């Protein structure tokens, strides 16, 4: 029957609608959607410590990193595949690869030696029979240091080509170890000398495939190369090896003495003709090296030859204005098809001029071509580099951040090229490989990415090869700050360790760095709730700007351009490594800056000590003046702004709730018990982006607390077992007026939801579902950020695997 228009009909329809809405609300719960995980693309972002190629299997390449695990190259998809994302937060130390070993007789076998730091007992061997698709994990009886000094050397781990289950491992502090059961158990080679040499230990182990029982081992001391010809029963120092510095290498001995009494063997490669090529330096690296060389040992005649690239044997000649020690050598690779064709790379010639060079030889090192010089446009003044146009994937997708915006050096490796239009040829280029299946294809890693060429032979004609970025799929950055505005062109703003920060409209494409000032770390970000185009950021700079504070800046155009604050707050200056936290009110006019900050990754950044001299400073004139507030007299990291109501700031610090309604000039204090909060050290207030005065607090094992009246009365909204170490909000579900909650922690005291992970709630904490799974743990999640415009999306900040965005599968 057709409905009639009239009061009775309207009331009936209203009653039906109301009834349906009531039923919907009563039945509302968090839907357990499936998720997909993708990287927020930087492409690289960290140090590539090794690139290892299988000697016979085409396109089987692995890249190891110091804090991001290992990747395998997938030629079909033209990208690197991360292999260690299953590592949990509890096993964070395992997300760093000390060494990679491949079985020359079985390309499916892969061995990874995992462990970041020597101060952790948690190290292990990951053993795969399927190229890293799955692993068996065996605890290691010794420590590893994938992010320690000497991580540039290797490989420390090697498979015996004559006994497929036998591996040898040169350790840092436990001597030479042998496993005869595929890395499950280990025994010490008790007769090996120099077991704990130099505090760094053994750098590399090489089996001679021509002679069963012959093994060469390189130790990080002068004269540190040893050989056994009876599988380790007896050892001798390789005779004739360099133990003192060649006078030709000591470029400026009066001004800068080597740090060791003689050359230390960094890497070794045994060519098929029996030539053992060795690179040398005066320190373990990857930083602090000042001298070094390259030698070759004829294993048949026992003769050593100095083949170091220098003035009389390389073309073009070394840069004539070089006024500092020439650095050492580390990276090396030999062509599998021609044992006299090899590349070597210098180490630590930074800051230049005459930066680190890659050299190519066709005659076993008698003569060299300087690949870096030949690849650099003329007129660079010795600052070798690629034209920025070459900083792109093979398909032409640009990786623009590698310019570093040509900003002033901040005092660390990887600073921008001083030549506008160039990106540095590289630094820490200790990982280099000539592809065994294609001698023209060469890859080299840097402190930031992987470069490659398919026509290295152009160097033979004194021409530049064509270079491109081959790092797609590798995401090794450390997340320090995340923000997702509720409007504008950018869905995500990021702050990263070592490489500044970025704004993303397209999450799948590399972006330019934020403009000057370039921050070596970007630790703090915020946006104005009612004017999301206004953004502020802060981080260490290291450059003494005379026209303002280089540690903090604001943007009025969504991050396209930036202006430095006129001055820094008291206690923050050029030498500050931790700039604290910064927040901006909803109108974009009031800014507070606290010198205290939270250490998300204790091994990577420290907490700036809090002081009781002042609370968070406030400015209304973009840093011309800073005012100390009343009512809050401690520098706290737990401060944020209301996203809707201007001039309103919140803080929960040392068991006290603070509320400011005058732009941070004064705060009213409420003891936790008075407003319904538990006794707790403090937490960052999370403000609703749509409703003034609505806030959430994630209080660890105490769960989540919620207020709708600016914190004057709080209610616990979670049940027993909910642990919220990190908390964020995002866009609500369809037809819901409530934002979605995300936590890092646990959502129950037992059962499936009691596992540590990332969880989502669509009904303000009543019910939860897990977002990630055991395959997507990334060594732990340090920070999370919901997206105010995309339901279900959450950004995951990691400590070595970059930033991941998790979306509900369509």
UniProtKB/Swiss-Prot annotation:
Origin superkingdom: Eukaryota
EC number: 3.2.1.150
Temperature-related activity annotation: Optimum temperature is 42 degrees Celsius.
Keyword Repeat: yes
Repeat region (BNR), residues: 126-135, 226-236, 359-369, 554-564, 617-626, 658-667, 705-716, 759-769
pH dependence: Optimum pH 3.0.
UniProt cross-references to InterPro entries, sorted A to Z: WD40/YVTN_repeat-like_dom_sf, Xyloglucanase_GH74
A GO MF term: oligoxyloglucan reducing-end-specific cellobiohydrolase activity
GO cellular component: extracellular region
Active site residues according to the UniProt entry: 66 (nucleophile), 498 (proton donor)
Keyword line: Carbohydrate metabolism, Cell wall biogenesis/degradation, Glycoprotein, Glycosidase, Hydrolase, Polysaccharide degradation, Repeat, Secreted, Signal
EC main group: hydrolase
Glycan-bearing residues: 32, 188, 298, 312, 321, 455, 544, 573, 612, 638
PANTHER family tied to this protein: OLIGOXYLOGLUCAN-REDUCING END-SPECIFIC XYLOGLUCANASE-RELATED, XYLOGLUCANASE (EUROFUNG)
Similarity-based family: Belongs to the glycosyl hydrolase 74 family.
The name this protein goes by in its record: Oligoxyloglucan-reducing end-specific xyloglucanase
Organism: Emericella nidulans (strain FGSC A4 / ATCC 38163 / CBS 112.46 / NRRL 194 / M139)
């Amino acid at each position: 029957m057709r409905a009639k228009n009239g009061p009775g009909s309207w009331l009936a329809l209203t009653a039906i609608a109301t009834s349906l809405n009531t039923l919907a609300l009563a039945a509302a719960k968090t839907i357990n959607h499936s998720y997909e995980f993708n990287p927020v693309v930087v492409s690289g972002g960290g140090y590539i410590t090794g690139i290892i190629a299988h000697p016979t299997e085409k396109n089987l390449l692995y890249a190891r990193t110091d804090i991001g695990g290992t990747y395998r190259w997938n030629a079909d998809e033209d990208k690197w595949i991360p292999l260690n994302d299953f590592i949990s937060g509890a096993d964070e130390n395992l997300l760093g690869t000390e060494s990679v070993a491949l079985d020359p007789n079985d390309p499916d076998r892969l061995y990874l030696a995992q462990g970041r730091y020597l101060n952790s007992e948690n190290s292990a061997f990951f053993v795969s029979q399927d190229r890293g698709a799955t692993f068996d994990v065996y605890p290691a009886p010794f420590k590893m240091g994938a992010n320690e000094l000497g991580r540039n050397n290797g490989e420390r781990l090697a498979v015996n080509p004559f006994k497929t289950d036998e591996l040898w491992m040169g350790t840092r502090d436990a001597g030479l170890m042998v496993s005869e059961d595929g890395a499950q158990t280990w025994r010490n080679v008790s007769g090996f000398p120099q077991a704990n040499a130099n505090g760094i230990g053994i750098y590399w182990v090489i089996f001679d495939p021509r002679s069963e029982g012959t093994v060469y081992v390189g130790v990080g001391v002068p004269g540190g190369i040893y050989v056994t010809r009876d599988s380790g029963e007896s050892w001798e120092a390789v005779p004739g090896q360099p133990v003192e510095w060649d006078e030709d290498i000591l470029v400026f001995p009066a001004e800068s003495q080597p740090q060791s009494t003689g050359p230390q063997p960094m890497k070794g490669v045994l060519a098929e003709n029996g030539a053992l090529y060795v690179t040398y330096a005066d320190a373990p690296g990857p930083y602090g090296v000042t001298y070094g060389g390259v030698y070759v040992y004829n294993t048949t005649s026992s003769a050593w030859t100095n083949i170091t690239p220098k003035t009389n044997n390389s073309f073009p000649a070394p840069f004539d204005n070089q006024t500092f020690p020439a650095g050492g050598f580390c990276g090396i690779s030999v062509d599998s098809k021609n044992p006299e064709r090899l590349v070597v790379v210098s180490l630590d010639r930074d800051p230049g001029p005459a930066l680190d060079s890659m050299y190519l030889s066709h005659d076993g090192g008698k003569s060299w071509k300087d690949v870096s010089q030949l690849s650099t446009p003329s007129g660079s003044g010795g600052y070798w580099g690629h034209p920025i146009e070459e900083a792109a994937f093979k398909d032409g997708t640009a990786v623009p951040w590698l310019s570093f915006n040509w900003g002033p050096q901040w005092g660390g490796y990887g600073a921008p090229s001083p030549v506008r239009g160039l990106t540095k040829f590289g630094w820490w280029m200790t990982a280099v490989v000539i592809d065994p299946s294609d001698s023209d294809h060469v890859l080299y890693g840097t402190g930031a990415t992987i470069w490659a060429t398919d026509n290295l032979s152009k160097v033979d004609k004194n021409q530049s090869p064509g270079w491109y970025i081959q790092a797609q799929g590798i995401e090794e950055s450390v997340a320090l700050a995340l923000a997702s505005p509720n409007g504008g062109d950018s869905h995500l703003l990021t702050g990263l360790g070592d490489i500044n920060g970025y704004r993303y409209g397209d999450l799948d494409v590399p972006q330019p760095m934020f403009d000057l000032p370039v921050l070596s770390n970007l630790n703090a970000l915020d946006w104005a709730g009612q004017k999301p185009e206004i953004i502020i950021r802060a981080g260490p700079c290291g450059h003494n700007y005379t026209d303002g504070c280089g540690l903090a800046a604001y943007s009025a155009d969504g991050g396209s351009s930036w202006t430095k604050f006129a001055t820094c707050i008291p206690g923050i200056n050029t030498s500050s490594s931790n700039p604290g936290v910064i927040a901006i009110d909803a109108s974009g006019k009031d800014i507070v800056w606290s010198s205290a900050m939270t250490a998300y990754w204790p091994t990577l950044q420290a907490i700036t000590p809090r002081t009781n001299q002042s609370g968070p400073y406030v400015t209304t004139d973009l840093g011309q003046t800073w005012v100390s507030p009343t009512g809050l007299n401690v520098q706290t990291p737990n401060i944020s702004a209301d996203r809707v109501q201007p001039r309103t700031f919140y803080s929960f610090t040392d068991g006290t709730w603070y509320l400011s309604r005058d732009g941070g000039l004064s705060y009213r204090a409420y003891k936790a018990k008075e407003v319904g909060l538990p006794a707790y050290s403090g937490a960052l207030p999370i403000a609703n982006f749509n409703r003034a005065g609505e806030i959430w607090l994630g209080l660890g094992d105490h769960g989540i607390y919620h207020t709708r009246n600016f914190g004057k009365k709080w209610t616990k909204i979670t049940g027993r077992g909910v642990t919220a170490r990190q908390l964020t909000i995002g866009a609500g579900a369809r037809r819901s007026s409530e934002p979605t909650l995300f936590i890092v922690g646990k959502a129950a005291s037992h059962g499936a939801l009691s596992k540590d992970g990332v969880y989502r709630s669509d009904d303000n904490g009543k019910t939860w579902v897990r977002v990630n799974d055991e395959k997507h743990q990334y060594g732990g999640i340090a920070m999370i950020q919901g997206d105010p415009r995309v339901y279900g999306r959450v950004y995951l900040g990691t400590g070595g695997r970059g930033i991941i965005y998790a979306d509900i599968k369509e």
